[in-house]
Amino acid sequence: MAITAQMVKELREKTGAGMMDCKKALTETNGDMEKAIDFLREKGIAKAAKKADRIAAEGLTFIETNGNEGLILELNSETDFVAKNEGFQALIKELAAHLLANKPANVEEAMAQTIEGGKTVEEHINEAIAKIGEKLTLRRFEIVSKTDADAFGAYLHMGGRIGVLTVLEGSTDEAAAKDVAMHIAAVNPKYIDRDAVTAEEVEHERQVLTQQALNEGKPEKIVAKMVEGRLGKFFEEICLLDQTFVKNPDMKVRQFVESKGGTLKGFVRYAVGEGIEKREDNFAEEVMNQVKGNN
Protein backbone atom coordinates (compact mmCIF):
# COMPACT_ATOMS: atom_id res chain seq x y z
CA MET A 1 0.00 0.00 0.00
CA ALA A 2 1.05 3.61 -0.47
CA ILE A 3 2.85 5.11 2.53
CA THR A 4 1.52 8.62 3.16
CA ALA A 5 3.19 11.53 4.91
CA GLN A 6 0.44 11.40 7.57
CA MET A 7 1.31 7.75 8.34
CA VAL A 8 4.99 8.64 8.70
CA LYS A 9 4.09 11.57 10.96
CA GLU A 10 1.90 9.37 13.18
CA LEU A 11 4.64 6.75 13.52
CA ARG A 12 7.19 9.44 14.41
CA GLU A 13 4.89 10.78 17.12
CA LYS A 14 4.38 7.31 18.57
CA THR A 15 8.03 6.23 18.55
CA GLY A 16 10.27 9.29 18.35
CA ALA A 17 12.15 7.66 15.45
CA GLY A 18 13.48 9.59 12.46
CA MET A 19 11.45 10.24 9.33
CA MET A 20 13.41 7.91 7.03
CA ASP A 21 13.41 5.13 9.63
CA CYS A 22 9.64 5.48 9.99
CA LYS A 23 9.12 5.40 6.24
CA LYS A 24 11.26 2.27 5.92
CA ALA A 25 9.42 0.57 8.80
CA LEU A 26 6.04 1.28 7.22
CA THR A 27 7.25 0.09 3.83
CA GLU A 28 8.65 -3.14 5.31
CA THR A 29 5.38 -3.84 7.15
CA ASN A 30 3.04 -2.80 4.31
CA GLY A 31 1.69 0.14 6.28
CA ASP A 32 0.73 -1.80 9.44
CA MET A 33 1.25 0.75 12.25
CA GLU A 34 1.58 -1.78 15.09
CA LYS A 35 4.00 -3.99 13.14
CA ALA A 36 6.00 -0.89 12.14
CA ILE A 37 6.39 0.02 15.84
CA ASP A 38 7.64 -3.51 16.55
CA PHE A 39 10.01 -3.30 13.56
CA LEU A 40 11.59 -0.10 14.90
CA ARG A 41 11.87 -1.48 18.42
CA GLU A 42 13.48 -4.71 17.20
CA LYS A 43 16.06 -2.60 15.35
CA GLY A 44 16.70 -0.63 18.54
CA ILE A 45 15.54 2.58 16.88
CA ALA A 46 12.39 3.15 18.94
CA LYS A 47 13.04 2.79 22.64
CA ALA A 48 9.60 3.61 24.01
CA ALA A 49 7.52 0.62 25.03
CA LYS A 50 4.40 2.70 25.50
CA LYS A 51 2.53 4.24 22.60
CA ALA A 52 2.01 7.97 22.99
CA ASP A 53 -1.65 8.70 22.39
CA ARG A 54 -2.09 12.09 20.81
CA ILE A 55 -3.84 14.54 23.07
CA ALA A 56 -5.61 17.15 21.03
CA ALA A 57 -9.06 17.98 22.44
CA GLU A 58 -9.49 20.65 25.09
CA GLY A 59 -11.53 20.70 28.28
CA LEU A 60 -11.09 19.57 31.88
CA THR A 61 -11.33 16.59 34.15
CA PHE A 62 -13.06 17.01 37.51
CA ILE A 63 -13.38 14.92 40.67
CA GLU A 64 -16.23 14.97 43.19
CA THR A 65 -16.32 12.93 46.40
CA ASN A 66 -19.15 12.53 48.88
CA GLY A 67 -18.66 10.18 51.81
CA ASN A 68 -17.78 6.76 50.44
CA GLU A 69 -18.51 7.59 46.82
CA GLY A 70 -16.34 9.40 44.32
CA LEU A 71 -16.63 10.40 40.69
CA ILE A 72 -14.22 11.45 37.97
CA LEU A 73 -15.42 12.95 34.69
CA GLU A 74 -14.13 14.59 31.52
CA LEU A 75 -15.91 17.49 29.83
CA ASN A 76 -14.54 18.53 26.45
CA SER A 77 -14.57 21.92 24.75
CA GLU A 78 -13.13 23.11 21.45
CA THR A 79 -10.56 25.51 22.92
CA ASP A 80 -8.49 25.80 26.07
CA PHE A 81 -9.78 29.36 26.49
CA VAL A 82 -13.35 28.13 26.99
CA ALA A 83 -12.21 25.50 29.49
CA LYS A 84 -11.18 28.42 31.73
CA ASN A 85 -14.57 30.12 31.32
CA GLU A 86 -16.65 30.57 34.50
CA GLY A 87 -19.70 29.09 32.78
CA PHE A 88 -17.73 26.00 31.80
CA GLN A 89 -16.35 25.64 35.34
CA ALA A 90 -19.87 25.91 36.79
CA LEU A 91 -21.23 23.35 34.31
CA ILE A 92 -18.62 20.71 35.11
CA LYS A 93 -19.36 21.03 38.84
CA GLU A 94 -23.12 20.76 38.24
CA LEU A 95 -22.63 17.67 36.10
CA ALA A 96 -20.35 16.05 38.68
CA ALA A 97 -22.86 16.60 41.49
CA HIS A 98 -25.71 15.22 39.37
CA LEU A 99 -23.80 12.15 38.18
CA LEU A 100 -22.62 11.24 41.67
CA ALA A 101 -26.12 11.61 43.11
CA ASN A 102 -27.97 9.76 40.32
CA LYS A 103 -25.35 7.20 39.22
CA PRO A 104 -26.26 6.64 35.55
CA ALA A 105 -24.68 3.56 33.98
CA ASN A 106 -23.16 5.43 31.04
CA VAL A 107 -23.06 8.77 29.21
CA GLU A 108 -26.12 7.95 27.08
CA GLU A 109 -28.21 7.27 30.19
CA ALA A 110 -26.82 10.37 31.88
CA MET A 111 -27.80 12.64 28.98
CA ALA A 112 -31.43 11.50 29.22
CA GLN A 113 -31.72 12.05 32.98
CA THR A 114 -33.54 15.05 34.40
CA ILE A 115 -31.46 17.71 36.11
CA GLU A 116 -32.63 20.76 38.08
CA GLY A 117 -35.42 22.78 36.50
CA GLY A 118 -36.96 19.76 34.77
CA LYS A 119 -34.46 19.83 31.89
CA THR A 120 -32.52 16.81 30.73
CA VAL A 121 -28.76 16.80 31.14
CA GLU A 122 -28.47 17.06 27.35
CA GLU A 123 -30.68 20.17 27.30
CA HIS A 124 -28.70 21.66 30.18
CA ILE A 125 -25.44 21.18 28.26
CA ASN A 126 -27.03 22.61 25.09
CA GLU A 127 -28.04 25.74 27.01
CA ALA A 128 -24.42 26.13 28.13
CA ILE A 129 -23.29 25.68 24.51
CA ALA A 130 -25.62 28.50 23.44
CA LYS A 131 -24.21 30.81 26.12
CA ILE A 132 -20.54 29.91 25.73
CA GLY A 133 -20.52 29.57 21.95
CA GLU A 134 -18.58 26.32 21.64
CA LYS A 135 -19.46 22.66 21.35
CA LEU A 136 -19.21 20.99 24.78
CA THR A 137 -19.20 17.22 25.24
CA LEU A 138 -19.58 15.06 28.32
CA ARG A 139 -17.09 12.46 27.17
CA ARG A 140 -16.85 9.98 30.04
CA PHE A 141 -17.16 9.45 33.77
CA GLU A 142 -16.59 6.73 36.34
CA ILE A 143 -18.02 6.27 39.83
CA VAL A 144 -15.81 4.68 42.50
CA SER A 145 -16.85 3.38 45.93
CA LYS A 146 -14.97 2.74 49.17
CA THR A 147 -15.68 1.84 52.80
CA ASP A 148 -15.17 3.82 56.01
CA ALA A 149 -11.85 1.99 56.42
CA ASP A 150 -10.47 3.30 53.12
CA ALA A 151 -9.29 6.63 51.70
CA PHE A 152 -9.87 8.30 48.34
CA GLY A 153 -6.82 9.61 46.54
CA ALA A 154 -7.96 12.49 44.32
CA TYR A 155 -5.61 14.67 42.29
CA LEU A 156 -6.11 17.20 39.50
CA HIS A 157 -2.96 18.19 37.60
CA MET A 158 -2.68 21.58 35.87
CA GLY A 159 -6.15 22.58 36.99
CA GLY A 160 -7.72 19.45 35.54
CA ARG A 161 -5.73 18.62 32.41
CA ILE A 162 -5.12 15.26 34.10
CA GLY A 163 -7.32 13.77 36.81
CA VAL A 164 -6.66 10.69 38.95
CA LEU A 165 -8.98 8.95 41.40
CA THR A 166 -7.84 5.93 43.39
CA VAL A 167 -8.74 4.11 46.60
CA LEU A 168 -6.26 3.20 49.32
CA GLU A 169 -7.89 0.19 50.96
CA GLY A 170 -7.37 -0.59 54.63
CA SER A 171 -6.03 2.89 55.41
CA THR A 172 -7.73 6.23 56.00
CA ASP A 173 -4.56 8.20 55.18
CA GLU A 174 -5.91 10.62 52.56
CA ALA A 175 -2.54 12.37 52.18
CA ALA A 176 -0.88 9.06 51.27
CA ALA A 177 -3.69 8.20 48.85
CA LYS A 178 -3.28 11.60 47.17
CA ASP A 179 0.49 11.05 46.90
CA VAL A 180 -0.19 7.83 44.98
CA ALA A 181 -2.67 9.69 42.75
CA MET A 182 0.00 12.32 42.02
CA HIS A 183 2.43 9.55 41.06
CA ILE A 184 -0.15 8.05 38.68
CA ALA A 185 -0.73 11.46 37.09
CA ALA A 186 3.00 11.93 36.52
CA VAL A 187 4.07 8.45 35.40
CA ASN A 188 0.89 7.14 33.72
CA PRO A 189 1.06 3.41 34.50
CA LYS A 190 -1.19 1.11 32.46
CA TYR A 191 -1.79 -1.53 35.12
CA ILE A 192 -1.93 -1.89 38.88
CA ASP A 193 0.54 -4.83 38.98
CA ARG A 194 2.02 -7.64 36.88
CA ASP A 195 -0.98 -9.91 37.41
CA ALA A 196 -3.12 -7.44 35.46
CA VAL A 197 -0.95 -7.68 32.32
CA THR A 198 -2.34 -10.20 29.83
CA ALA A 199 -0.26 -13.24 28.89
CA GLU A 200 -0.55 -12.16 25.24
CA GLU A 201 1.00 -8.76 25.95
CA VAL A 202 3.86 -10.31 27.94
CA GLU A 203 4.55 -12.85 25.18
CA HIS A 204 4.46 -10.13 22.52
CA GLU A 205 6.96 -8.06 24.50
CA ARG A 206 9.18 -11.13 25.02
CA GLN A 207 9.28 -11.75 21.26
CA VAL A 208 10.15 -8.12 20.49
CA LEU A 209 12.91 -8.07 23.12
CA THR A 210 14.29 -11.40 21.89
CA GLN A 211 14.53 -10.14 18.31
CA GLN A 212 16.03 -6.89 19.58
CA ALA A 213 18.78 -8.77 21.44
CA LEU A 214 19.52 -11.00 18.44
CA ASN A 215 19.73 -7.94 16.17
CA GLU A 216 22.29 -6.50 18.60
CA GLY A 217 24.45 -9.56 17.89
CA LYS A 218 24.17 -11.06 21.37
CA PRO A 219 25.02 -14.79 21.68
CA GLU A 220 21.88 -16.92 21.69
CA LYS A 221 22.86 -18.61 24.96
CA ILE A 222 22.58 -15.32 26.89
CA VAL A 223 19.62 -13.86 25.02
CA ALA A 224 16.99 -15.54 27.22
CA LYS A 225 18.56 -14.16 30.40
CA MET A 226 18.85 -10.69 28.86
CA VAL A 227 15.22 -10.78 27.79
CA GLU A 228 14.02 -11.65 31.29
CA GLY A 229 16.01 -8.72 32.67
CA ARG A 230 14.52 -6.36 30.11
CA LEU A 231 11.05 -7.74 30.82
CA GLY A 232 11.55 -6.65 34.42
CA LYS A 233 12.14 -3.09 33.19
CA PHE A 234 9.07 -3.39 30.97
CA PHE A 235 6.93 -4.23 34.00
CA GLU A 236 8.41 -1.29 35.90
CA GLU A 237 7.34 1.03 33.08
CA ILE A 238 3.71 -0.10 32.95
CA CYS A 239 2.84 -1.52 36.41
CA LEU A 240 2.10 0.98 39.19
CA LEU A 241 3.22 -1.08 42.19
CA ASP A 242 6.54 -1.97 40.49
CA GLN A 243 7.42 1.67 39.77
CA THR A 244 9.89 3.83 41.65
CA PHE A 245 7.83 6.23 43.78
CA VAL A 246 8.19 9.78 42.44
CA LYS A 247 8.18 11.38 45.91
CA ASN A 248 10.80 8.95 47.26
CA PRO A 249 13.10 7.34 44.67
CA ASP A 250 14.46 5.00 47.35
CA MET A 251 11.27 2.94 47.41
CA LYS A 252 8.74 1.38 45.07
CA VAL A 253 5.08 2.42 45.11
CA ARG A 254 4.27 -1.01 46.58
CA GLN A 255 6.57 -0.34 49.55
CA PHE A 256 5.06 3.11 50.11
CA VAL A 257 1.51 1.74 50.10
CA GLU A 258 2.46 -1.10 52.46
CA SER A 259 4.18 1.36 54.81
CA LYS A 260 0.79 3.06 55.22
CA GLY A 261 -0.87 -0.25 56.10
CA GLY A 262 -3.00 -0.27 52.97
CA THR A 263 -3.42 -1.92 49.61
CA LEU A 264 -4.20 -0.52 46.17
CA LYS A 265 -6.70 -2.36 44.00
CA GLY A 266 -7.14 0.01 41.08
CA PHE A 267 -7.17 3.57 39.76
CA VAL A 268 -8.81 5.79 37.16
CA ARG A 269 -6.64 8.25 35.24
CA TYR A 270 -8.11 10.67 32.70
CA ALA A 271 -5.97 12.94 30.51
CA VAL A 272 -8.01 15.52 28.60
CA GLY A 273 -8.53 14.49 25.00
CA GLU A 274 -6.41 11.33 25.09
CA GLY A 275 -7.13 9.29 21.99
CA ILE A 276 -9.06 12.12 20.30
CA GLU A 277 -7.64 13.48 17.05
CA LYS A 278 -8.37 17.15 16.47
CA ARG A 279 -9.02 18.15 12.86
CA GLU A 280 -5.88 19.72 11.41
CA ASP A 281 -6.71 22.66 9.15
CA ASN A 282 -4.13 24.17 6.85
CA PHE A 283 -2.85 27.31 8.59
CA ALA A 284 -3.32 29.51 5.51
CA GLU A 285 -6.87 28.20 5.10
CA GLU A 286 -7.53 28.87 8.79
CA VAL A 287 -6.48 32.51 8.41
CA MET A 288 -8.58 32.88 5.25
CA ASN A 289 -11.60 31.35 7.00
CA GLN A 290 -11.21 33.85 9.85
CA VAL A 291 -10.90 36.75 7.40
CA LYS A 292 -14.01 35.61 5.50
CA GLY A 293 -15.88 35.22 8.76
CA ASN A 294 -15.12 38.83 9.69
CA ASN A 295 -16.46 40.22 6.40
From Swiss-Prot:
GO cellular component, one term: cytoplasm
Segments for region (Involved in Mg(2+) ion dislocation from EF-Tu): 79-82
Main location: cytoplasm
Keyword Protein biosynthesis attached: yes
Record keywords: Cytoplasm, Elongation factor, Protein biosynthesis
Function text: Associates with the EF-Tu.GDP complex and induces the exchange of GDP to GTP. It remains bound to the aminoacyl-tRNA.EF-Tu.GTP complex up to the GTP hydrolysis stage on the ribosome.
This protein's name: Elongation factor Ts
Organism in which the protein naturally occurs: Bacillus mycoides (strain KBAB4)
